[in-house]
Amino acid sequence: VEAEGCYVIPGLVDIHFHGCVRHDMCDGTEESIQALADYEAANGVLAICPATMTIPEEELFQAMKAAKGHKNGKGADLVGINMEGPFINKEKKGAQKEEDIKLADVELFHKLQEAAGGLIKLVDLAPETEGAMDFINQVKDEVHVSIAHTMADYDTASEAIRRGADHITHLYNAMPPLNHREPGVIGAARDSDCYVELICDGVHIHPSCVRATFEMFTDKRIVLISDSMMATGMEDGQYELGGQPVTVVGNVATLTEGGAIAGSATNLMDCMRTVVKEMHIPF
């Protein structure tokens, strides 16, 4: 291999992405999981923890069963599942389908975990919703709990972290902004040991904010993610995310109805290049 003038780095790990090359984790098929694994490996990502969406319960179970049946060996290794929905706040649903949003449910989670063969490594929730704090108490020792799609204030987020939540899903996105009198989830995360996800595709977060975030959290607590959807690796056009139509132009993916950002169309390796080359974060 001729590598003069290049960097040689370990393979990346993407703990939060939905799809690529017209396939999605929520398809619930071996074909789609293998397509994700192949594309990611070809783009420098050697371990994947794809995310599910807020979708009908039967479809969620099918996605879990498909993951359980997948055999690693070709492409990136499937090392877990990030369960992004359905335990979120409707006010911050983003590109998630409102009709499938549910209150945090320990029994449902355990059934999904059984269907997945224990592969769920992250479960996301809005801590201000009914039953969420009790949910954290009951599952914190068996799965990482991530604060996501939330309207939580500083005190509520801090209490969730005290109870065992140790991760923040796509910091800044689908949560109240940092305010000097109402620091919210972002402030609570800063004052804790939580890991925080950043979508650094150049669309979701302004470069100045990314640089400030690295100053606040350091690279020891920041997890770069792609949050990519099925248009990644494809041409512009019409796609789908969580059962909703998505329009993709360049690297910008938005819901066709409403215009909300609907994941990214950028793989993790390209996100990392953007962070280093365009946002000037030291490599």
Question: Positions of the model-derived regions?
Answer:
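Divalent metal-dependent hydrolysis catalytic cores, especially in the metallo-beta-lactamase
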Residues: H18, Q34-A63, A76-N89, A116-E128, ...
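Conserved phosphate-binding/catalytic loop of the ribokinase/pfkB sugar-kinase fold
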Residues: N89-A115
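His/Asp/Glu-enriched, well-ordered alpha-helical/loop segment
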Residues: A188-L198, F214-S226, A231-F283
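Active-site mouth loops of central-metabolism enzymes
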Residues: G19-E31, A95-K102, H144-A148
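Active-site core of metal-dependent hydrolases
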Residues: H110-M234
